[in-house]
Design a protein with these regions (language model features):
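Helix-loop-helix hairpins and the membrane-proximal interhelical loops
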Residues: 1-51, 164-165, 197-283, 424-428
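Residue-level signature of catalytic and energy-coupling elements of molecular machines
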Residues: 21, 41, 125, 193, ...
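Short, hydrophobic transmembrane alpha-helix segments
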Residues: 37-49, 69-72, 90-95
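Transmembrane helix-loop junctions in multipass membrane proteins, especially transporters and channels
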Residues: 43, 68, 72-76, 121-122, ...
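Loop-to-helix transition at the N-terminal end of transmembrane alpha-helices
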Residues: 45-65
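Transmembrane alpha-helix interface/packing and boundary motifs in multi-pass membrane proteins
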Residues: 63-76, 185-190, 251-258, 289-299, ...
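Membrane-embedded alpha-helical modules
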Residues: 95-208, 325-433
Length: 433
């Protein structure tokens, strides 16, 4: 036991074991919805849902364990909400790449992230993207995720005259609306694991509605589903073009900003921050994140990143890797509960998707809307992400518009050289399309 304490940075004289374990459980409950949502999203590309569930649970366990041992911090990892939507609905369903090519892109992104972390280049990447655009990108992804949830449940449907309209009143759409309201109520009441409980409740409600289908001979516990359908399923040949290069760049910086933002935000005002305001062992935490992304791609899931829900465990008093270790153990246990999680209908996850969108939207209040040179590119970023149904297009158009507005309004010194180069490459891509 003493060896484990040392590996995770737990000092019994300084920290309370019960508090750390409770914090780990709290973190797991608040983020366990990913075990239902991620397979649901990625399976739209044709990936095997059972294999994706195993990949999700396994990569979450491994990534969180790496955080515990390398960084000794109370953070948990899992496939990113937002990037999984980018993977499925932009990269595969919109741009037309195979899911094998998308997995290859994620694997390469992880390797690049590892290199950037080892050589301390990540700071240059962070400085490349203007602060207001970072917040706008987060808000835009929030809108995008919510739109996906509503569309998949039939709450919003296609319409030739108005492009989109409200769908028909069906058991599926009804269950989705119930999930949205229930999720909102539980979060308002500050219930730990609100999204998880909402998904469970909607799955149960879906039984009499005929939405939740229970197969004959159902058993809640089984051996983990096979990884074979997704394990090492890479198509590297598809990466040899400009679109994929830009896509990998987008994945890298989304992962970096997601991780840095979560680490700094959740660790603020705790002893995990040093006197300069930096997160202790942040390099090790970033390295764990990068390795987990490549491991996740090998298993068969989209980018693994540090979850903002880790803040729930930290709020419960989690301060060391023991919190992360206990969360990791719970993800391993979840591997054997695949039948339960795979029973969850898509409509039951709509509430979680919409509420995650709402939480991500909160970053829009950080955008400086009084400065039009900042507000317009931010607005373009958010709007085009949703209207083009493409996160990458929104990011690209936001960066280009930011650079052009600053350049022609005489504020060209506010744009760094890296952003000029990136914007020029993005603009060239549109010209050559």
């Amino acid at each position: 036991m003493q060896a484990l304490y040392k590996w995770v940075g737990f000092d019994p004289k300084k920290y309370n074991l019960r508090t750390e374990l409770l914090a780990g459980l709290t973190t797991f409950l608040t983020m366990s919805y990913i075990l239902a949502v991620n397979p649901d999203i990625l399976s739209t590309t044709g990936m095997d849902k059972g294999a994706v569930f195993t990949a999700t649970a396994l990569s979450s366990a491994i990534g969180t364990l790496l955080i515990a041992f390398l960084a000794k911090l109370p953070f948990a990892q899992a496939p990113s909400m937002g990037i999984n939507a980018f993977f499925a609905f932009t990269l595969v369903l919109s741009m037309g790449y195979s899911w094998q090519a998308a997995l290859a892109a994620v694997f390469v992104e992880g390797i690049i992230f590892i290199i950037l972390t080892i050589f301390n280049i990540r700071e240059q990447i962070v400085r490349c993207i203007p602060k207001n655009l970072r917040f706008a990108i987060s808000a835009g992804i929030g809108f995008f995720i919510a739109f996906i949830g509503l569309k998949n449940a039939g709450v919003i449907v296609a319409n030739e005259a108005t492009f989109v309209t409200l769908g028909a009143f069906t058991p599926v759409s009804t269950l989705a609306v119930i999930g949205i309201i229930l999720s909102g109520v539980l979060i308002t009441l500050r219930v730990r694991g609100a999204l998880f409980y909402s998904i469970v409740a909607c799955t149960i409600i879906g039984i009499p509605l005929g939405v939740t289908q229970i197969p004959d001979g159902f058993t809640p516990v089984s051996m983990p589903k096979s990884l074979a359908p997704t394990f090492l399923q890479f198509d590297f040949k598809a990466l040899l073009n400009m679109d994929m290069a830009l896509t990998i760049f987008a994945l890298v910086f989304m992962d970096i900003f997601n991780t840095v933002g979560t680490l700094i935000g959740a660790a603020a005002k705790t002893e995990m921050m040093d006197e300069k305001g930096n997160v202790k062992n942040i390099k090790e935490a970033m390295l764990a994140d990068a390795v987990a992304t490549s491991v996740g791609a090998v298993c068969g899931t989209s980018t693994v990143t540090t979850f903002v829900e880790s803040g729930a465990g930290i709020a419960e008093g989690g301060r060391t890797g023991m919190t992360a270790f206990s969360t990791s153990v719970l993800f391993i246990i979840a591997l054997f509960l695949a039948p339960l999680f795979l029973l969850i209908p898509s409509a039951a996850t709509t509430g979680a998707l919409v509420l995650v969108g709402v939480l991500m939207l909160s970053s829009i209040q950080e955008v400086d809307l009084t400065d039009m040179s900042e507000a317009l590119p931010s607005f373009i970023t958010v709007l085009t992400m949703v209207l083009t149904y493409n996160i990458a297009e929104g990011m690209a158009l936001g960066l280009i518009s930011y650079t052009l507005v600053k350049l022609f309004s005489g504020q060209w010194r506010q744009v760094n050289l890296t952003l000029y180069i990136v914007s020029a490459l993005l603009l060239l891509r549109y010209i050559l399309m």
